[in-house]
A protein has these predicted regions:
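Short, low-complexity disordered leader/linker segments with a strong preference
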Residues: 1-38, 336-338
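Conserved C-terminal helix/tail region of periplasmic/extracytoplasmic solute-binding proteins
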Residues: 306-338
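Pocket-lining segment of extracytoplasmic ligand-binding domains
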Residues: 98, 107, 179-273
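Short, glycine-/small- and polar/acidic-enriched structural segments
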Residues: 32-169, 173-177, 186, 193-199, ...
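Predominant activation on well-ordered alpha-helical scaffold segments within soluble catalytic domains
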Residues: 54, 100, 158, 203, ...
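Soluble non-cytosolic domains of exported or imported proteins
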Residues: 74-78, 93, 147, 151-155, ...
Length: 338
């Protein structure tokens, strides 16, 4: 009996060790054998608009701090947020409005924004007809494809339209039935007069002679925190070192982009746009330099955050404003800039 009890005890010990090993492996499943931490990040779309991010990846700024980015494209802020909340991705990259909505829903482990990349809308208004003397009043009686209703591209355009003295409901038609990734093809093959497109798509449409860039939505709307990085509050608290290193890499990318020419940036990020030639990529990047699209630091200012909420409120998509200090955690951005 004694021998049998010892055997049972030994079996129990081995089982406990095996379970413990599995738990440890699971908790470290994002850490490779070489010490590199793999981070799954979901970006809202693939665009030249996010050049500082791609520079940070290709220039090795993340790897310098022991981070390997596994990048996926969510095609929409909703999809990105779902990926983060489900744990499929650790970091999301989309508009801060997604975090505002989640907070207002009363979710306990809501997401916090810890670094800002772009500081204005990155879309350009593209016309079917060439118009060297475009005026926003030209939109009267026309059909525009602005993206999904409730999305920031839609709301920012609507904000500009109102600022220009037009009524978005009676003076023109905003066709919000087209999915974000189908807007360009719907415009070139359909009857809409205008569409809002990001680069390099906008410049490519113009190069093909299927449309003409007539205005920058972001230049007209002014500064708002258009795209930023966020993660669940609990994840940030439990991974402060990684979040700091991630933010440091983004800041290095922002500085590099500021200090280099459009062509140099195009050469640095071309691997992310294999179907776009270097000249077109350079043109697209210059468009963003011309409108001062990128934040110089990862810090998200309260003034621009409040303006974003004003834009959303005017569109009727925000029942109550969220507190800046709940949604935004600038600690890591400030540290990166030291």
């Amino acid at each position: 009996m004694k021998k049998k009890a010892i055997i049972i005890l030994i079996i129990i010990i081995f089982v406990a060790i095996a379970i413990g090993t599995i738990i440890v492996k699971k908790s470290n499943n994002n850490v490779a054998q070489d010490g590199i931490q793999k981070i799954k990040m979901s970006e809202v779309t693939r665009s030249v608009f996010y050049a500082p991010q791609y520079v940070a990846i290709n220039n090795g700024y993340f790897k310098d701090d022991g981070i390997e980015i596994e990048l996926t494209t969510g095609q929409g802020a909703d999809a990105v947020m779902t990926s983060v909340l489900s744990g499929e991705s650790q970091i999301g990259f989309a508009g801060p409005e997604a975090s505002i909505y989640v907070y207002n829903e009363g979710k306990e482990d809501y997401t916090q924004v810890f670094a800002q990349l772009t500081k204005r809308d990155g879309s350009f208004l593209v016309s079917k007809e060439k118009n060297d003397n475009f005026n926003w009043s030209n939109l009267k009686g026309k059909t525009v494809i602005p993206g999904r209703k409730g999305g920031v591209p839609y709301m920012t355009l609507e904000y500009v339209i109102k600022q220009k003295g037009l009524n978005s409901k009676t003076d023109l038609r905003l066709d919000d039935s087209i999915k974000f990734d189908l807007m360009a093809s719907a415009f070139t093959s359909g009857t809409a007069d205008y569409v809002t497109l990001f680069e390099p798509t906008a410049s490519n449409i113009q190069k093909l002679g299927k449309g003409y860039i007539v205005a920058s939505v972001g230049k007209e709307a002014g500064e708002i925190p258009y795209t930023a990085y966020f993660a669940k509050k609990s994840y940030i608290q439990n991974n402060e070192k990684m979040i700091q290193e991630f933010t440091n890499a983004i800041y290095k990318g922002q500085k590099w982009v500021k200090e280099h020419t459009a062509k140099e940036i195009a050469e640095a990020i071309q691997s992310f746009f294999p179907d776009t030639d270097l000249d077109l990529l350079t043109t697209a990047i210059q468009s963003y330099k011309d409108i001062d699209a990128w934040n110089e630091t990862p810090v998200l200012k309260e003034e621009s955050f409040n303006k974003l909420q004003d834009v959303i409120s005017e569109a009727g998509e925000l029942k109550q404003k969220a507190p800046y200090d709940k949604i935004v955690n600038n600690n890591y951005a400030y540290n990166a800039c030291k």
